[in-house]
Amino acid sequence: MSLDNCKKVAAYKAVDDFVKDGCKIGIGSGSTIKYAVDRIKELGLKNVICVPTSFQSTQLIVEAGLELSDLSRTPELDITIDGADEVDKDFNLIKGGGGCQLQEKIVAYSSKKLVIVADHTKESTELGENWKKGIPIEVVPMAYVPVMKKLESSSFSLTPKLRMAVNKAGPVVTDNGNFIIDAQFSKPLSNIPQLAIDIKMIPGVVETGLFVNMTKIAYFGQTDGTCKVKSI
């Protein structure tokens, strides 16, 4: 089974388990979320309200004909369904490979439950075991050089790179008008909760792609067509 089909298996199973009539749902971003939106549409549920985490998920919601809202009108959500770049044994996450971690974190924090859906390659024992692109860090444009220098210092010993755009000249610009630094690490991360706090405290850092203590359940689609559900 292809990775796309693994993603579909996970997304369909999570939607079937958690999304009911009248649900207020945060819709994450990334390649797996398309399948979650497809399944919500297929089920034909009534009075389902969807809050997006990015321009991409806004488009998915609109194209599916689902009811679109935002946190101003719907500030409390029942559930957010989102993907992840990596999930470790303690349910620490790295997110932000698609550059949407700030809005994803805001929407997830506004939800009673965050459910992660992914293919089997996103499950690991420690962060960095499978995901090799580093921690995505959203920064104010004027601060990206000082932030990178701080991340390189002995306080962090990370290797930061400004994420560059593919189809335009210059850096990637987020939906919020900020830049993204990918902070790579050469060995498994330790004390992830403290690391997330320390990076966030650097002036100019808007948000990090480290999600700590935000979810207790993840769905991983397997190559044999089954779905592995992990929870704590």
Swiss-Prot record:
Taxonomic superkingdom: Eukaryota
Q: Establish whether keyword Isomerase is in the entry.
A: yes
A single GO CC term for this protein reads: cytoplasm
Matches recorded under Gene3D superfamilies: 3.30.70.260, 3.40.50.1360
What's its EC?
5.3.1.6
Recorded metabolic or biological pathway in which this protein acts: Carbohydrate degradation; pentose phosphate pathway; D-ribose 5-phosphate from D-ribulose 5-phosphate (non-oxidative stage): step 1/1
Q: Which InterPro entries match?
A: NagB/RpiA_transferase-like, Ribose5P_isomerase_typA_subgr, Ribose5P_isomerase_type_A
Q: Name one GO biological process term.
A: D-ribose metabolic process
**Keywords from the UniProt entry:** Isomerase
GO MF term (any one): ribose-5-phosphate isomerase activity
Q: Isomerase: is it a keyword of this entry?
A: yes
- What does the record give as the reaction this protein catalyses? aldehydo-D-ribose 5-phosphate = D-ribulose 5-phosphate
- Similarity section: Belongs to the ribose 5-phosphate isomerase family.
Specify the protein name. Answer: Ribose-5-phosphate isomerase
Q: Which organism is it from?
A: Dictyostelium discoideum
Query: Organism classification, top ranks?
Result: Eukaryota, Amoebozoa, Evosea, Eumycetozoa, Dictyostelia
User: Which gene name belongs to this protein?
Assistant: rpiA
